[in-house]
Amino acid sequence: MSSPLASLSKTRKVPLPSEPMNPGRRGIRIYGDEDEVDMLSDGCGSEEKISVPSCYGGIGAPVSRQVPASHDSELMAFMTRKLWDLEQQVKAQTDEILSKDQKIAALEDLVQTLRPHPAEATLQRQEELETMCVQLQRQVREMERFLSDYGLQWVGEPMDQEDSESKTVSEHGERDWMTAKKFWKPGDSLAPPEVDFDRLLASLQDLSELVVEGDTQVTPVPGGARLRTLEPIPLKLYRNGIMMFDGPFQPFYDPSTQRCLRDILDGFFPSELQRLYPNGVPFKVSDLRNQVYLEDGLDPFPGEGRVVGRQLMHKALDRVEEHPGSRMTAEKFLNRLPKFVIRQGEVIDIRGPIRDTLQNCCPLPARIQEIVVETPTLAAERERSQESPNTPAPPLSMLRIKSENGEQAFLLMMQPDNTIGDVRALLAQARVMDASAFEIFSTFPPTLYQDDTLTLQAAGLVPKAALLLRARRAPKSSLKFSPGPCPGPGPGPSPGPGPGPSPGPGPGPSPCPGPSPSPQ
């Protein structure tokens, strides 16, 4: 048994509480979200700590108690579901990141492929400039050669006469070299693509109404002047130009034609007619806007054709009797002169005053009568132009055949596969005569068309040709024999003035025992 002093030296060990507890109550620990992971790691053997009152100093000692298993299973299911959702979200984001990385890599490769290297871009630009320079040099050489064909030479303009617009700077800070010099602008000389035909016709009608009907005008003539009634000027309006009087044709792109149209549309008479008609003149308009005037660039030969390399079996006396005096007639002289000449925007009549002067000294022959022969090709072409005017015309052969006396000219529209016999039959029908009574020939080259089965294409009469007619001639080698007595000895009779042998005088046997020939 120990002494009291020994017991005083011993101290009693009191356990320290883990957390402050209210005296007289048991402490219950409340779990939050941060403790859910710790609870899962503890397993099913988790305990709930409860503080109970102690017999020493009122300090409660913790007491362990078993937690029910149903609460742990619900918590486990909740955490498993939440973990599954997080894993799925992480997987989807990972796949999206991988897809975007692949797209970025592909776009970077494409950018590297399309991005030209500086050296390659400079080389390509240099090749383009060299090609353009070669092309421009070739065009300059062609234009200089074209000008030299007409005896012209390009002079150009000095650099100090540039437009003020050439000194402007573009938005990129570079000078526009295309405006550094004055270049020809096609729009300054070309007509607008569209012409208001309705407005033009209305303006011409208004101008014609300004002239009093039956008005007269003093016209100078050789030896004085006379009053003439104003006759309407024929004006044909085509799709590509106009034609006043009998020509020449004035296309819309010609500057003089543009000035004429501008005067008409502004309500004035054309300035080129001011000298001939100072007080105005009415117009007789032919609306042919649906037709295109074909500009072949060559005027028809106004003179008389000549045959080269053909021998004429005529005597000199016959030629003198056939062509007495000068071969130049008044009509031929007028045909060599132009009808009208445009000088400084004015139409000058050439043939009119000269015709009036020659009319007093020598009568002018009648003009050649042109007769259009109605052919199947002409009827078909007329029907085609009415039904479908925009379709291109088929290849045709236009024949101009002059009669024997030169007073008539027959115009025939034929197909290239038609024959000479078809032409002969149509001419015989138009002239109301036998087809065998005339011959068809050409002067250059001198050709006589006798084969009626020969086509126009094979004869070289496409697309147009000028032919002549003449009376059919008998063969030159044909001889007619007439019965008669054979000449005896002595001087032989002369058969006639024509060529042929003439037996000379002297005895001898009869030259022909039968009938004597006499040339036709």
From Swiss-Prot:
Q: Where is this region: 3 X 8 AA tandem repeats of P-G-P-G-P-G-P-S?
A: 487-510
State the UniProt keywords alphabetically: Coiled coil, Cytoplasm, Cytoskeleton, Repeat
Q: Which parts of the sequence belong to the UBX domain?
A: 392-469
Its name, as the record gives it, is: UBX domain-containing protein 11
One biological-process term from Gene Ontology? proteasome-mediated ubiquitin-dependent protein catabolic process
Q: Where is the composition biased (Pro residues)?
A: 484-520
According to its UniProt record, where is this protein located?
Cytoplasm, Cytoskeleton
- The organism named in the record is Homo sapiens (Human)
Sequence ranges assigned to domain SEP in this UniProt record: 230-294
Ranges where the record places region Disordered: 1-26, 476-520
Name which cysteines form disulfide bonds. none
* GO molecular function terms attached to this record: ubiquitin binding
Main localization category: cytoplasm
Coiled-coil intervals in this record?
Answer: 76-149
Q: What does the function comment of this entry state?
A: May be involved in the reorganization of actin cytoskeleton mediated by RND1, RND2 and RND3. Promotes RHOA activation mediated by GNA12 and GNA13.
Q: How does it assemble?
A: Interacts with GNA12, GNA13, RND1, RND2 and RND3.
Q: Name one GO cellular component term.
A: cytoskeleton
